[in-house]
């Protein structure tokens, strides 16, 4: 697989070998950065971050990654300051901006926008989210985090908790995990179960999948608990939401039954699905997970720029 | 002419020698950048981009140019995030910001703002548009593009198409072209003809100027067709606009009569005055023209910073 | 005092030795920058500027300082483009952003926000204003300016003019000046006198403090006149404001009685409390004062990053 010039649009475009390449490159870059303090792989290169809708954490993570590689950044943080307002097509905007840079990171409210940008641009395009919150770099940093914490992904028992129906983050992660030998525990209220076709796909690929509505029943088995925000606005009935909400908050009491090695992850931002009291336990790794976004994005930038 | 510390406010301040210096410096920097990948002329220098009104493409082009020279960038993309809101005068804002940087690029909705900024500031000021869309760097990149495509400007037949009445871009380009031995074809609907005083000025300076309302009549003669956006909002009558619009769209049919060497330019953004089907023809160079903005702005920055 | 990793939240946290360290480091960095053109103390380091409310001059000053040190900058200029909108706590935002950077500069509308950020973050946090316009770097650059102009602070007669009641900038400056042997002249309308408890505190610390409502009476004695904006909106009565306003404008007439060495300072932005005609006199140093913000912020960044 030639990485130079490659677009990164969906995790579905990645083979297991691709994923392993990204994880190994991220590990190497993280180590080199720690040793040397400053890398110069992307010296003289320019990243354009085109955020047609705001997403501070994702934008700052990519910009940090580019700077850590010694490169420069241009771009915009929201569409209101972009020339999109003048009625220009996305196609023309991309054809224009690519003249100013070596790689594009795009975030766009419309599904398919990143794919279109990739088709139009000659420089590589990385999808930082289009239409939903799903984006391939989140899944890659999730996998990187699991591997870094346990030294492996194979053999782990991984629980996904929360909104498994609409949450694209957990859909992508579950699909990517089929490359590995893991047991998957899907923990959600009835209303928010993982769609049937995804569960079937996971099982067809040989994955052991357990579904439950009660975290307490499975917490003792898990190596990883991946928590997602339950989005209140999805619920037709406020009372229904409130009942569900309480039963799913991860707090110290729930964790009494957890294994010592349990790691709790979250793509953030969180609202109340993890109580702040959990932050100081050895289980909480969600801020380390945030940190891991930087080496993973460094790896992707270095690979598609062809500088590593 | 000493370039170090010079302000770049209007193309009218430029002699032919000045223009040639910019074009030659741009050519040199473009070549050096290609050979070395990274230049360091502006290492340790800071550009402040003060965009009192948004203009993403112009801002990103300047920022890219500064980074390509190895320099750094600070600034703001729109006035709402600037301290202008606190009732500070433009004069004080400029006197303040110049303490933080080595060169200023300013875009401002009020005509004369860039000239005022230049008078106030001790660091050099480059006008990225004030009051109208005219700005000298557009004209310079237009000239650079023509020279790069043909190896010369003299002897060419250049058509300007569209709104020649209000379009400052074409006014500036036409005036700058009087330094060269070109034939100018002014193609526009009656309502949007080039103002009489400009046409007279061009002819007084010895330029051959032909005016027409019909692109088809002259397309076969042209080496360059410079297309501008016809701004719908200028027309008192929607029907009149629609009739005009159709007759002026550059598409494959119109291009059947064009010379092989014809190059089509556009300052962008475009709306529908060039059909996307033209993009893949050998005639379309408007995205290369966008790219040329970078070496031209690199040249200006390096010259006024006195680092080349 | 170990500076590496230290937070800079309030000038009240600073000993005289701390202040002297910052001033000496700023002087050294300003000299080195002049000699070498470009410093690399912060090469490979990343500053995150988190401006939850806009403050262009402060943000650009910090960003300039970081670039002058050879470092990189990420961040946002106003809260609307940040993920705060998704209901995330400030605590989580800080814990997240610190994963992307080596030092944080924060500006926040709520008092106490910077202190909270400092408690949460493992990277050093510098307060660029929270709740009021007071921030420690303003006071430090004011002291640096006085020392640079006179070679010393001890022995000077310093006047503070304007809104001494609400103006936190002058409160902080007055408090910091108790470390030095200065005479302080508090010049304000009756309604805007310095709060009693501050005046008493100053006197208890041995400072000679003179209060007056009439600039003309004391202008001839002063070495420094520090002017602040009188904020119209504080006045219950427009007529009262207008009367006060006129009597306090610093203009050429008022300056007739001033000593030759008088230096006029202002934290800016100004509205009309200093007439523009004063700008070109030898007394006006408020734009040099702006410039001094850069070496002072360079010093703070270098110190808390532990790179000097």
Swiss-Prot record, chains A, B, C:
Keywords: Pyrimidine biosynthesis, Transferase
Organism domain of life: Archaea
A Gene Ontology biological process term: 'de novo' UMP biosynthetic process
Pathway: Pyrimidine metabolism; UMP biosynthesis via de novo pathway; (S)-dihydroorotate from bicarbonate: step 2/3
InterPro entries for this protein: Asp/Orn_carbamoyltranf_P-bd, Asp/Orn_carbamoylTrfase, Asp/Orn_carbamoylTrfase_sf, Asp_carbamoyltransf, Asp_carbamoyltransf_Asp/Orn-bd
Enzyme Commission designation: 2.1.3.2
Keyword Transferase: yes
One Pfam short name: OTCace
Reaction catalyzed: carbamoyl phosphate + L-aspartate = N-carbamoyl-L-aspartate + phosphate + H(+)
Binding site for L-aspartate: 86, 168, 229
Assembly: Heterooligomer of catalytic and regulatory chains.
Function summary: Catalyzes the condensation of carbamoyl phosphate and aspartate to form carbamoyl aspartate and inorganic phosphate, the committed step in the de novo pyrimidine nucleotide biosynthesis pathway.
Family membership noted in the UniProt record: Belongs to the aspartate/ornithine carbamoyltransferase superfamily. ATCase family.
PANTHER family reported for this sequence: ASPARTATE CARBAMOYLTRANSFERASE, ORNITHINE CARBAMOYLTRANSFERASE, MITOCHONDRIAL
Name of the protein: Aspartate carbamoyltransferase catalytic subunit
The species this protein was found in: Pyrococcus abyssi (strain GE5 / Orsay)
